């Protein structure tokens, strides 16, 4: 995957996940950034747990989480 694409995705991921998150049952948990978490884990496995090789994936996950929490705070 192209590193630039990984960095640009968090906001679009939130927009795609927003309906699923807002329509979930009250007892349900939905993380729109789970895809980024999965990609990070796959990268770590692929690179023998070398964190330096996966820094773009980690940053994309952090950016997604930050965007998500900001959106939720603004909504409240």
UniProtKB/Swiss-Prot annotation:
What keywords are assigned to this protein?
Disulfide bond, Mitochondrion, Transit peptide
Q: Which InterPro entries does the record cross-reference, listed alphabetically? A: COX23, Cys_alpha_HP_mot_SF
Keyword Mitochondrion attributed: yes
What gene name is listed for this protein?
Answer: COX23
Q: Where is this motif: Cx9C motif 1?
A: 33-43
Q: What does this protein do?
A: Required for the assembly of cytochrome c oxidase.
Query: Listed disulfide bonds for this chain?
Result: 33-64, 43-54
Ranges of residues in domain CHCH: 30-72
Q: Where is this motif: Cx9C motif 2?
A: 54-64
Q: Which GO terms describe its biological process?
A: mitochondrial respiratory chain complex assembly
Q: Which residues form the signal peptide?
A: none
Record keyword Transit peptide present: yes
**PROSITE patterns linked to this entry:** CHCH
Q: Where in the cell is it found?
A: Mitochondrion intermembrane space
| Protein name in the entry | Cytochrome c oxidase-assembly factor COX23, mitochondrial
Q: Which GO terms describe its cellular component?
A: mitochondrial intermembrane space
């Amino acid at each position: 995957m192209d590193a630039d694409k990984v960095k640009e995705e968090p906001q679009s991921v939130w927009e795609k996940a927003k309906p699923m998150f807002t329509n979930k049952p009250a007892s349900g948990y939905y993380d729109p950034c789970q895809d980024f978490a999965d990609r990070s884990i796959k990268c770590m496995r692929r690179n023998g747990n070398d964190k330096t090789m996966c820094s773009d994936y980690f940053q994309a996950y952090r950016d997604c989480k930050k965007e998500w929490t900001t959106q939720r705070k603004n909504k409240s």
